[in-house]
C-alpha cells in the first residue's frame, strides 16, 4: 500500500511514536550508477512470434538461474510464496523464482512465457493478491534491491522496499516522495503512480522517474525513457504494476532532502462531518508545502483525525492548522507538532512491517463532496477506515495525458481499508462494496490502481480514464500475447 493504515493512525494522533515531482530535474545527464544490468539492445519492434505452449521444463530453467527456484513440496516454498496479506496464503503458484540478476528474469520470461501466467513481485502488497497467482509463476525480485545515490540520481533495484530507499536517500541528503509503508516495494508504488506524504510539494513518485530497465514479454531487455521506448516509458508512469513487462531497475531524479514539521490533530467524537467539510475547503487553499490526510474511522461513534507534514517550521505550520480548526468549529482533543529531518520524518510515518489481513478499495475526490454522506458510510462499520489523502499542488501540474496517471485534477484519494479474516471475508467484502458505491453516489468516482479492487465494476475507467485506450495499445505492442496477465491487466 502507498500509505500504510497504521501510519495514518499514527500521524493522525492515535500514537506519537516515532514518499517525485512533475518536471523536477536536478541537472546533468541521467547516468545509471552501480547497475549490474546487462547491456540493453537498441530500440526495436517487439516480437510478433507467439510464445510456445505446453508444460514448462522446470529442470531446464533451474540450470539457467543463479537464484533459487521453489516448487510446491519444497521446504522453503510456503514461506517464499507468501505475500503481505495473509488472506492470500491459500493461493499456490506453480513456482517461485528468487531472481538474483536481470539474466534470471530474462530466463524466466524466455522459458515460461505462454506456458503459465507470470507475475513479478517486489513488496507483495497487491490489494487483490495478484502477485501470488494461483497456478502461475512468481518472479520474486526482492534480492535485486540495491540502492545507489550519486549526485541528483538514485538507481534503485526493482526489489527494493521503501525502508531501503529512504535509508539510502537520507544518508545522501536526498529525497524522493513516496509512500509510508516500509515494506512496500518501489516497483508497484512507482508503476501505479506513487501517492505519498510529499506529493503536494514534489509530485508523484512516477514523476521523478527518468528511465527504467524492462524485460519485455519476448525476454529482451530494453531501456524505457523519454527518448527510448517512449510509449513504454509513458505507460510505466501510472499504468499499474504487472503490465507490459518486468521492470528490473529504476533511475530517479531526486531533490535535496528538506527538513519537515509533522503534525497530528485528534478531534472529538461527533465532529467528523464538520472537520471533513472544512478540510476539503482548507487544503486546496494551502501552499503545496503542506500535505495533509484525514482519517474517518468507522464505528459508533465515528472518529476523525487529521495528520500530515509541512516543508517548513512549526510556527508557519501552526498558523495553517489554526485556520483549519477555526473553520471546522472543533477544538482538537490532542495536537502534536514536531520538527524532524527528512529521514526522521519518513520513519515517523512508517506503519507496521507486520503482515495484515484486510480488504481495500478506493475512490477519487475531484471537488468537495457532501461530508455528512461520507461520514455516514463509516457509521457502525467498526474496523473500516476511510483514509483520505490530500492531492493537488505539484501532482496537478502535468496534463492528465502526460503520463498514464489520470487523476491529476484530484483533490484527494479515498482509500477504503477494512480489517478482515478468512472467516468474515465475504461479509467484509460486501461492506466494502457498499462503501465504494456510497462514495460514488456522494460524488467520489474513479479509483487508484495501487489500491486495486477486483470487485470494482468500472475499474478500467476508474483507474485510467481516457488513458485506458492508449495503455491497451502499449500492452498490445509490448505484450501481444498477454504473457503478463491477471484479473485487471490492461489488455483485458
Question: For each predicted feature, which ranges?
Answer:
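Soluble FAD-dependent oxygen oxidases
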Residues: 2-492
Amino acid at each position: 500500500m502507498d500509505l500504510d493504515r497504521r501510519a495514518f493512525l499514527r500521524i493522525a494522533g492515535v500514537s506519537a511514536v516515532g514518499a517525485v515531482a512533475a518536471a523536477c530535474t536536478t541537472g546533468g545527464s541521467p547516468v545509471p550508477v552501480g547497475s549490474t544490468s546487462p547491456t540493453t539492445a537498441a530500440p526495436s519492434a517487439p516480437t510478433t512470434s507467439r510464445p510456445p505452449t505446453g508444460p514448462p521444463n522446470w529442470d531446464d530453467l533451474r540450470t539457467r538461474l543463479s537464484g533459487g527456484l521453489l516448487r510446491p513440496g519444497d521446504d522453503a516454498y510456503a514461506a517464499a510464496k507468501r505475500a503481505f496479506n495473509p488472506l492470500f496464503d491459500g493461493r499456490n503458484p506453480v513456482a517461485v523464482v528468487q531472481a538474483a540478476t536481470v539474466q534470471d528474469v530474462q530466463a524466466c520470461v524466455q522459458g515460461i512465457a505462454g506456458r503459465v501466467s507470470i507475475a513479478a513481485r517486489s513488496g507483495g502488497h497487491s490489494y487483490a493478491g495478484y502477485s501470488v497467482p494461483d497456478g502461475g509463476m512468481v518472479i520474486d525480485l526482492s534480492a535485486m534491491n540495491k540502492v545507489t545515490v550519486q549526485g541528483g540520481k538514485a538507481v534503485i533495484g526493482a526489489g527494493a522496499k521503501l525502508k531501503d530507499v529512504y535509508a539510502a536517500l537520507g544518508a545522501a541528503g536526498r529525497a524522493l516522495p513516496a509512500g509510508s509503508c516500509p515494506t512496500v516495494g518501489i516497483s508497484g508504488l512507482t508503476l501505479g503512480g506513487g501517492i505519498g506524504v510529499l506529493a503536494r510539494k514534489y509530485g508523484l513518485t512516477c514523476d521523478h522517474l527518468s528511465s527504467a530497465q524492462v524485460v519485455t514479454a519476448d525476454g529482451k531487455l530494453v531501456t524505457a525513457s523519454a527518448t527510448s521506448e517512449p510509449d513504454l516509458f509513458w505507460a510505466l508512469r501510472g499504468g499499474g504494476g504487472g503490465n507490459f513487462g518486468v521492470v528490473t531497475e529504476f533511475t530517479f531524479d531526486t531533490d535535496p532532502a528538506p527538513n519537515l514539521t509533522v503534525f497530528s490533530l485528534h478531534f472529538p467524537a461527533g465532529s467528523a462531518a464538520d472537520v471533513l467539510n472544512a478540510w476539503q475547503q482548507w487544503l486546496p487553499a494551502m501552499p503545496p508545502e503542506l500535505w495533509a490526510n484525514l482519517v474517518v474511522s468507522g464505528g459508533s461513534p465515528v472518529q476523525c483525525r487529521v495528520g500530515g507534514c509541512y516543508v517548513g517550521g512549526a510556527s508557519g505550520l501552526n498558523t495553517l492548522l489554526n485556520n483549519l480548526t477555526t473553520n471546522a468549529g472543533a477544538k482538537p482533543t490532542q495536537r502534536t507538532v514536531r520538527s524532524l529531518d527528512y529521514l526522521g520524518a519518513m520513519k515517523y510515518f512508517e506503519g507496521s512491517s507486520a503482515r495484515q489481513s484486510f480488504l481495500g478499495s478506493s475512490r477519487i475526490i475531484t471537488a468537495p463532496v457532501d461530508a455528512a454522506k461520507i461520514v455516514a458510510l463509516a457509521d457502525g462499520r467498526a474496523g473500516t477506515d476511510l483514509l483520505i489523502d490530500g492531492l493537488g499542488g505539484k501532482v496537478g501540474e502535468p496534463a492528465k495525458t502526460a503520463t498514464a496517471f489520470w487523476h491529476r485534477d484530484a483533490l484527494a484519494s479515498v482509500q477504503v481499508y477494512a480489517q478482515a479474516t478468512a472467516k468474515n471475508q465475504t461479509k467484509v467484502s460486501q461492506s466494502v462494496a457498499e462503501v465504494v458505491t456510497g462514495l460514488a453516489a456522494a460524488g467520489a468516482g474513479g479509483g487508484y490502481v495501487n489500491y486495486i479492487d477486483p470487485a470494482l465494476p468500472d475499474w478500467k475507467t476508474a483507474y485510467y480514464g481516457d488513458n485506458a485506450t492508449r495503455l491497451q495499445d502499449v500492452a498490445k505492442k509490448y505484450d501481444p500475447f498477454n504473457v503478463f496477465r491477471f484479473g485487471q491487466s490492461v489488455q483485458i
